[in-house]
Amino acid sequence: MTMPTVSMRVNGQLVSHVVEENTLLVTYLRECLGLTGTHIGCDTGQCGACVIHVDGVSKKSCTILAVQADKREITTIEGIAEGDELHPMQQAFHENHGLQCGFCTPGMIMSAIELIEGNRDITELEIRQGLEGNICRCTGYHNIVKAIAAAARSQ
């Protein structure tokens, strides 16, 4: 049996590799492409550390096979900054101390980008509900919520 070839656009670059059928997208991103900003926390879809955008929608990459991402547009945390300039959500996390150890931060940021899209007046409750499925073991989420609200207001 031959292994499938996957082709997708990752952070604006067309990539193509032969993969095993059971390779998770998070594993493909980290091991084949060296994009280690997408973290593996639980490997079961519980923690949100692996959130990326698939065709502009937040998805947990540990729940998607690489073959399911064939011909899709993938954006990881490495693909959101403009050169040396942080993405506004990254900047808001920095300015509002929205991280401690940083392990959950890439997934939080990727989820938050979609969450605030077109919603400058998002409420704290909407932010907290929108982050369900993204776990931070270090903080009480206060500064994360503050950072997301700041990014929403700045768009």
Provide a role label for each language-model segment.
Residues 1-155:
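Signature of N-terminal electron-transfer/Fe-S-associated modules in redox systems
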